[in-house]
């Protein structure tokens, strides 16, 4: 099964002022991401407010991204849901429209507390798109599924034919690497922590990843990998440190989903506000965030159109 090389973006979902999905900016969005070195998108996930979307909206978004994706640009559809039946339907739809792959995080309710529960969840969803690679999206901070991922790999190995790997969005670089080493790298371990790309590269990982701050800082995150491959460790270190400074700023403004989405407006692509229950930024907060970003010369270095 093909492994992803390079960084995939987790895009935000554009909304109109009235809260309806705005499909119009997606073409320009896709072109901008490709221009800045991103290799594809992982849509309708946490950054995309997937759990705040209806099933119809999720399918329409998948169709729109497929329509506008540049040649060779991978579209991976997050199909996770609290309803496995809905997830399987979304998986079937993703395969039907020609998506490159699918993924699913564990549901926030009911909380998954055992490996077998998680395996069964993944198994049923993956069966909805048997011809597509399936990635489990490990983000336990969102759903409380603090389960050992090495045990998940052992459990799915030979049981789920299209299980491709894990989008690993957790703080344990040790566990990430142990998963990467399982059976000499059998599974595709996509790095999901933009703040630790460089240390993961140092262990031999992070050849592929899915990021959230890639939306506006992808050019620098891609640069970390490029500098590492070129043997320019100092450049890679400087880019990683800068990227952490950007993350420090968004952490002051409710993180990437809220603060990061507002950054898109500041760099020229207004994607609207977040859906309830997210607390949107005020104009005053936006001004403060902009000043903090200017202080680190972000706008001279960010993604460009």
Describe every region a protein language model picked out.
Residues 2-145, 303:
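Active-site beta->alpha loop and helix N-cap motifs at the rims of alpha/beta catalytic domains
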Residues 5, 39, 44-47, 79, ...:
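Short glycine-rich loop/turn motifs that provide flexible caps or phosphate-binding loops at active sites
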Residues 25, 57, 151-152, 232, ...:
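Single-residue recognition of alpha-helix capping/boundary positions
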Residues 26, 58, 62, 87, ...:
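A general structural signal for well-ordered alpha-helical segments in protein cores
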Residues 35, 199-305:
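Structured C-terminal cap/extension of enzyme domains
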Residues 36, 60, 64-68, 93-97, ...:
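Alpha-helical structural signal in soluble globular domains
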Residues 49-50, 110-111, 172, 198, ...:
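Short secondary-structure capping/turn micro-motifs that flank functional sites
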Residues 126-132, 140-244, 250-251:
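Catalytic alpha/beta core domains of metabolic enzymes, predominantly
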């Amino acid at each position: 099964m093909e492994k992803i090389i390079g960084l995939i973006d987790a895009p935000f979902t554009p909304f109109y002022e009235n809260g309806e999905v705005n499909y119009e900016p997606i073409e320009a969005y896709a072109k901008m991401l490709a221009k800045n070195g991103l290799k594809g998108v992982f849509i309708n996930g946490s950054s995309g407010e997937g759990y705040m979307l209806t099933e119809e909206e999720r399918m329409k978004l998948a169709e729109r991204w497929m329509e506008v994706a540049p040649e060779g640009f991978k579209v991976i559809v997050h199909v996770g849901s609290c309803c496995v039946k809905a997830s399987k339907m979304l998986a079937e739809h993703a395969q039907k429209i020609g998506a490159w792959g699918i993924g699913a995080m564990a549901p926030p309710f009911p909380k998954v507390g055992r490996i077998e529960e998680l395996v069964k969840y993944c198994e049923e969803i993956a069966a909805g798109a048997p011809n597509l690679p399936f990635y489990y999206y490990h983000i336990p901070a969102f759903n409380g599924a603090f389960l050992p991922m090495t045990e998940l790999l052992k459990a799915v190995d030979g049981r789920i034919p299209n299980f491709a790997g894990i989008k690993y969005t957790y703080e344990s670089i040790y566990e990430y690497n142990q998963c990467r080493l399982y059976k000499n790298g059998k599974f595709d371990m996509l790095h999901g922590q933009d703040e630790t790309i460089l240390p993961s590269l140092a262990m031999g990982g992070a050849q592929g990843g899915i990021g959230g701050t890639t939306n506006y800082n992808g050019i620098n995150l891609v640069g970390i990998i490029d500098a590492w491959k070129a043997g320019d460790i100092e450049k890679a270190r400087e880019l990683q440190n800068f990227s952490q400074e950007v993350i420090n700023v968004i952490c002051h403004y409710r993180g990437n989903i809220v603060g990061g989405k507002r950054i898109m407006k500041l760099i020229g692509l207004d994607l609207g506000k977040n859906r309830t229950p997210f607390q949107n930024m005020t104009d005053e907060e936006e001004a403060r965030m902009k000043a903090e970003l200017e202080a680190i010369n972000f706008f001279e270095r960010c993604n460009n159109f």
